[in-house]
């Protein structure tokens, strides 16, 4: 007998919705803080106990909720943020689905006190989504929500939570992203009474970066900006010399909403291409503004994923912006960076520093009990000199056209070789200090730019071979090369069918090195075979990188003084002489002042 179809109760529906909206304590924090942001808050306090499993309290000074709307706010799909279908495609707020409050309330004990500031406040208590009590009371403008006993009625959910440090890390990550997205809001986050994050809310994104990642990272960040008809981008990109082992430090924010988008991450990585070592990732924060109609945020209840109707155009704008920004800078790392980088890489954790030199916006006292316990810094917590450096850091001003042209002509100064170490590193000097150059990386960069230009030209000037080259392949590779023939022609390899599983090559580009033609052809073909599908752009790029690496001088290769001079002079003509195509540094500098400090000649 067929089972009857019945309508689910509201309580059960809310529990099902909670499975998508409220996965862990961090989900509760995210939804409630986003509500506070949408309410126009300028100060938000987040108090968490035992990684949110014991209690989560969010206090804001936003607009509050009218007394007659308080109970309605806990009904599923009840919201003040959209009214009709048209509003759904022009969402300006972080929340709009009306699912967060009922979903959170359905799996916890929840108490909310709220006031619009024009009348008495309202207090409401719920357990498992059921209203236990609602009463009027005195409260200042804003809202306080306290969530306790999370997942008390869904014990299976507790089994899938991670350790307390992991859950706390998830909460911290969410709040870091929200703080980066809203530098004009003061966030104060504490765990078990201990402050973990505090931002000033003064609108300075760089100050937020300092509070989250540390002053040393903020000092290494440079402003980026770009604009098109559809997009306006601003933010900060940290110099390539400071990088991380994962993508967690890439923050993309669209219309005030932190989002995850693989295509935009790829675009950012493309912008850093050849500037970062393989397997390393940048630290960057991008704030992107666009018309809400070209971004669909109604993809998933968590609202982390979005669909962009002009994703490719945005990606190209981001990549070009990053490339142009770094092309204007001299990216020679100093010798001291090695120690700092090593310390950073030991933990690979987000470091937080709290600046005491800026006044923090006053937090509203909504209720009789204190919000955050007063924090009195100890001597160890006293601000160091470095904590104030951001105040006096020089700002990056756009260069004039003449300055940009001069920069482009000479990216690195004239250097005079004084010797070679282990037949691998060139030591050079000038009035600015000492330079150490990786000879392989230096020539690799030079040859990469040469091959990239030659392969990109697709010149039809070919050198006929007196003796054509015949290449045989296994059947599977032969079939794949048949499909790739057009792409190979774009990089100068012209294959003609020649018997079973064979190709004949009768000519090659004139720039191929003499007596290395067959080796070059095989290496380019191997590059095409290395990936199941490859674009012409990537094939050209990978081929240029491969050829430059194989054709450059190696370590343990002795050079004469004339050889070193020629290499350094040619390197000065490169468009980006600071890293090899794999992102490793070409040059490291020790300034005269740094050397004098090391030898205690200056203090």
Curated annotation (Swiss-Prot):
Source superkingdom: Bacteria
Keywords: DNA damage, DNA repair
Keyword DNA damage attached: yes
Region (Disordered): 337-383
CDD domains: HATPase_MutL-MLH-PMS-like, MutL_Trans
Signal peptide span: none
InterPro entries for the chain: DNA_mismatch_repair_CS, DNA_mismatch_repair_MutL, DNA_mismatch_S5_2-like, HATPase_C_sf, MutL/Mlh/PMS, MutL/Mlh/Pms-like, MutL_C, MutL_C_dimsub
One Pfam family named in its UniProt record: DNA_mis_repair
Compositional bias annotation for Basic and acidic residues: 337-347
GO CC terms, sorted: mismatch repair complex
Molecular function in Gene Ontology: ATP binding; ATP hydrolysis activity; ATP-dependent DNA damage sensor activity; mismatched DNA binding
PANTHER family given in the database record: DNA MISMATCH REPAIR PROTEIN MLH, PMS, MUTL (PTHR10073), DNA MISMATCH REPAIR PROTEIN MLH1 (PTHR10073:SF12)
Family: Belongs to the DNA mismatch repair MutL/HexB family.
Protein known as: DNA mismatch repair protein MutL
Provenance organism: Listeria monocytogenes serotype 4b (strain F2365)
Source species taxonomy: Bacteria, Bacillati, Bacillota, Bacilli, Bacillales
Originating gene: mutL
């Amino acid at each position: 007998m067929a089972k009857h179809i019945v309508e689910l109760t509201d309580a059960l529906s809310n529990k099902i919705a909670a499975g998508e909206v409220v996965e862990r304590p961090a989900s509760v924090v995210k939804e409630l803080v986003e509500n506070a942001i949408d309410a126009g808050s300028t100060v938000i306090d987040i108090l968490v106990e035992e990684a949110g499993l014991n209690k989560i309290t969010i206090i804001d000074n936003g607009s509050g909720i009218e007394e007659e709307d308080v109970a309605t706010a806990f009904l599923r799909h009840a919201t003040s943020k959209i009214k009709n279908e048209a509003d759904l495609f022009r969402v300006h707020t972080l929340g709009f689905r009306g699912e967060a409050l009922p979903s959170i309330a359905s799996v916890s004990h929840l108490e909310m006190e709220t006031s619009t500031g024009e009348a008495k406040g309202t207090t409401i208590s719920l357990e498992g989504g059921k209203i236990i009590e609602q009463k009027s009371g005195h409260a200042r403008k804003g809202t306080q929500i306290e969530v306790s006993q999370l997942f008390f009625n869904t014990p299976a959910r507790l089994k899938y939570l991670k350790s307390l440090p992991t859950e706390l890390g998830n909460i911290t990550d969410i709040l870091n992203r929200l703080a980066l997205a809203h530098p004009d809001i003061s966030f104060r986050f504490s765990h078990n009474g201990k402050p973990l994050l505090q931002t000033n809310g003064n609108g300075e994104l760089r100050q937020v970066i300092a509070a989250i990642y540390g002053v040393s990272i903020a000092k290494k960040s440079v402003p980026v900006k770009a604009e098109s008809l559809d997009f306006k981008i601003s933010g900060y990109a940290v110099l390539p010399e400071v990088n991380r082992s994962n993508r967690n430090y890439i923050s993309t924010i669209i219309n005030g909403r932190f989002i995850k988008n693989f295509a935009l991450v790829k675009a950012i990585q493309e912008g850093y291409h050849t500037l970062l070592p393989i397997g390393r990732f940048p630290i960057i924060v991008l704030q992107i503004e666009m018309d809400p109609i070209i971004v669909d945020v109604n993809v998933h209840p968590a609202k982390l994923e979005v669909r962009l109707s002009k994703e490719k155009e945005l990606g190209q704008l981001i990549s070009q912006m990053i490339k142009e920004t770094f092309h204007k800078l001299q990216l020679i790392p100093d010798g001291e960076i090695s120690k700092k980088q090593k310390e950073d890489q030991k933990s690979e954790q987000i470091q937080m520093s709290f600046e005491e030199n800026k006044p923090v916006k006053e937090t509203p006292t909504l209720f009789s009990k204190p919000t955050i316990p007063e924090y009195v810094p100890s001597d160890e917590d006293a601000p160091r000199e470095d904590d104030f450096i951001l105040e006096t850091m020089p700002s990056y001003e756009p260069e004039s056209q003449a300055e940009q042209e001069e920069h482009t002509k000479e990216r690195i100064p004239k250097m005079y070789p004084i010797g070679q170490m282990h037949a691998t590193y060139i030591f050079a000097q000038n009035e600015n200090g000492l330079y150490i150059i990786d000879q392989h990386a230096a020539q690799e960069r030079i040859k990469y730019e040469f091959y990239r230009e030659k392969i990109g030209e697709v010149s039809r000037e070919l050198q006929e071979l007196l003796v054509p080259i015949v290449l045989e392949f296994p059947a599977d590779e032969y079939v794949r090369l048949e499909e790739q023939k057009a792409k190979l022609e774009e990089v100068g390899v012209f294959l003609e069918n020649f018997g079973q599983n064979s190709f004949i090559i009768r000519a090659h580009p004139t720039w191929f090195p003499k007596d290395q033609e067959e080796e070059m052809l095989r290496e380019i073909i191997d590059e095409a075979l290395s990936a199941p599908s490859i674009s012409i752009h990537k094939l050209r790029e990978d081929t240029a990188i491969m050829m430059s690496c194989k054709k450059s001088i190696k370590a343990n290769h002795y050079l004469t003084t004339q050889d070193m001079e020629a290499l350094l002079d040619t390197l000065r003509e490169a468009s980006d002489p600071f890293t090899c195509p794999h992102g490793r540094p070409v040059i490291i500098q020790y300034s005269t002042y740094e050397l004098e400090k090391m030898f205690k000649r200056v203090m």
